[in-house]
From Swiss-Prot:
Name the UniProt record assigns to this protein: Inner kinetochore subunit fta2
Biased amino acid composition, Polar residues: 54-66
Top-rank lineage group of the source organism: Eukaryota
UniProt keyword rRNA processing present: no
Role of this protein: Component of the kinetochore, a multiprotein complex that assembles on centromeric DNA and attaches chromosomes to spindle microtubules, mediating chromosome segregation and sister chromatid segregation during meiosis and mitosis. Component of the inner kinetochore COMA complex, which connects centromere-associated proteins and the outer kinetochore. COMA interacts with other inner kinetochore proteins to form the inner kinetochore constitutive centromere-associated network (CCAN), which serves as a structural platform for outer kinetochore assembly.
Gene source species: Schizosaccharomyces pombe (strain 972 / ATCC 24843) (Fission yeast)
Keywords: Cell cycle, Cell division, Centromere, Chromosome, Chromosome partition, Kinetochore, Microtubule, Mitosis, Nucleus
Gene: fta2
Lineage: Eukaryota, Fungi, Dikarya, Ascomycota, Taphrinomycotina
Quaternary structure (record): Component of the heterotetrameric kinetochore subcomplex COMA, which consists of fta2, fta7, mal2 and mis17. The COMA subcomplex is part of a larger constitutive centromere-associated network (CCAN) (also known as central kinetochore Sim4 complex in fission yeast), which is composed of at least cnl2, cnp3, cnp20, fta1, fta2, fta3, fta4, fta6, fta7, mal2, mhf1, mhf2, mis6, mis15, mis17, sim4 and wip1.
Amino acid sequence: MSGRRYSQISQQEGSSSSDDSDSQQKKTKRTVAHRSPNTTLNGMPRVDSRARPNENSGQSKSSNGRVDTDRKMDLLRKRSNLVHQTLLLEKEVRVRRNAINQRDDSFLSGFIKSLLEIDSSVVIYNTENPDNPKTKQVMPSAEPKKHVKLNSSISSIRFTQHEFEAESEKIIHHSLKGDIEYLPSFKFLLEIKVRTIDYALLFITYKIPHFARKELSSFSDSAIQCLDIVALLRAFSLFAHHYSYRCNTWFYLSKHMKKVASANMDAQCFYVQNSFYKITILYEIKFDDLGFVQPNYCISYILKNQNEKIVSITSKLLNQLDKRFSEFVSLFGFREGSLLLLQALFKPHLG
């Protein structure tokens, strides 16, 4: 009885376990059957790594293409604007240049006419035709005047002799001799050719004193190449002014410094020295493109004593000498500033 009951219980347990396994298999089959192809076994969405990059690549290429096209169009528009602005600027420059050239030509013609003192009288240029002896050509003459003063910018120039000769019916060769009012030793000669119809300048040559050639010839040569007689005469006048001022300054410094040191000079430099050092002041006459003077001056020194202690002391004394020189000149002018600095450097107890 008890054995039969035990076998029944075992059969029931076996049947229940088999039922559980069957139900689990059915459940698993249902889960697999209802799972989408785009999901994993755990039910998570599957990511297709092959399709998406291709789509993004196509989109990025198209967007990059649009950006490049827009950038090119923008650059082309900017280039077109720059070309247009450049053309407008070039046109404006040409208009202004033509106006300036016309004004300069008019001024130069009037200047030459005034310079040569051309009046209403005429000089006969002999072009008689053998077939018609009465045929002659006439042209304006330039009557010489002594000590002719020009406009205020070059008023110091004096013309002492004026000779002319007709080279053709339209060209007159003029020879002008003159000097500078405050430097009579600066005597010059100008040879010019002028077209009588419009007083246009065709040719210039010049002669100046030997002492002026070193500093004046370079600018004068460039001026005659440009046929700029105004700048040439202005340079003559201003050179004479600065040359005279420089000479007077050297004599002024020499008068005061010879009491305390040895002083010497040449055209461009002034030298002062004692047993310890030698000071040199340089004054050069230089010109800009219009013939105005831009003087260049500086100071330098040379140590003479070889004693280390003295060299050390003098080096400290002369340190930043250029800077001190510039300060003195800006405060007191070139002449007085140079004198005050030299007096400070050459006190009696130093040399």
